[in-house]
Amino acid sequence: IASIGAALQDPSKIIGIHFFNPAPLMPLVEIIPAVQTSEETLNISRSLIDGWGKVTVLCKDTPGFIVNRVARPFYGEALRIYEEGIADFATIDWAMTSIGGFRMGPFTLMDYIGNDINYTVTETVFTAFYFDPRYKPSFTQKRHSEAGYLGRKSGRGYFDYREGAANPKPIEDAVVGQQIFDRILVMLINEAVDAVFLNIGSKDEIDLAMTKGVNYPKGLLKWADEIGLENVLLKLEAMFAEYGEDRYRPSPLMRRMVKNGERFFE
């Protein structure tokens, strides 16, 4: 947003406004002031959008804003689980919907969004964060995109949408399903906690953004309180020790809160 504002005669009037698809139906709008944005521009913009009956959240001018930053592991970790041979697309989606309560599994959602679009967003975020391994793109998604398996719009993606096509059924193993759900959830929570740590948004607005912007069954920080931050930290530390990859590093705020026995909400 700041780079766009730099080209204006009056940069104080620049502000980012991010709707969610489909915009007439999805209630959330992210409002992103740049470093040049005046208080007047921010207040007028928020008042206008509130007047449309939208739910607004304020976030820092960083890659992905709140939602597209925090949601990366929903796709990235699901792809990683598939690449490790732990489960197929259908089983991972089953785990996230039937056990996790999400409206769509990650592969169904990526097919809905379009693999070309979702991959491009991931690649852009990865580059913008100076190649932080937490946002590393997947070769599986890259190859699907290159093959033209873009999802619903092309008739094929992770699933086959052509008339008469038969897709594999999930393996409904409760133990494996719980492991899949737990792994993706703790990664999502870690991103949400880190967004608080880096002042990307307030804890209330981060939880609001994820429930109203991408229909998560509950806010991730509230979820962390319910599970227990200490349990989330244990799972992340176990993955970090097993893989030795920086993508699994726990947020410093999580470590601090566990050490002090703190919660996000009372």
Ranges and model annotations:
Residues 1-266:
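N-terminal glycine-rich phosphate-binding loop for ADP-containing cofactors
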